[in-house]
Amino acid sequence: MAKKSLIQREKKRQKLEQKYHLIRRSSKEEISKVRSLSDKWEIYGKLQSPPRNSAPTRLHRRCFSTGRPRANYRDFGLSGHILREMVHACLLPGATRSSW
């Protein structure tokens, strides 16, 4: 189980990313339209002005049940070991255990 403070920090990053999403997108569109290099540098400065935690690359996918940030399956939103436990308990329809 992940610490609650880390999960809250991740939620805060998600809120910041949503808040500054339009600013980032509009400035990136401006960069593609502008031809002069000096204007591009000004827009790059605007792009760096939002907080670092508002960047989408700083977000992690976390397991819904444990909050684990690693080994997540996008289809289920679960970490690997929780997914395995749920498959063994027949809680995920259509998922089969592998055996060799």
Swiss-Prot record:
InterPro entries: Ribosomal_uS14, Ribosomal_uS14_bac/plastid, Ribosomal_uS14_CS. GO terms for molecular function: rRNA binding; structural constituent of ribosome. One of its GO terms (cellular component) is ribonucleoprotein complex. GO terms for biological process: translation. It is found in: Plastid, Chloroplast. Keywords: Chloroplast, Plastid, Ribonucleoprotein, Ribosomal protein, RNA-binding, rRNA-binding. Gene3D superfamilies: 1.10.287.1480. Its main location: plastid. Belongs to the universal ribosomal protein uS14 family. Part of the 30S ribosomal subunit. NCBIfam families: PRK08881.1 (NF006477). Binds 16S rRNA, required for the assembly of 30S particles. This is Small ribosomal subunit protein uS14c. The gene is rps14.
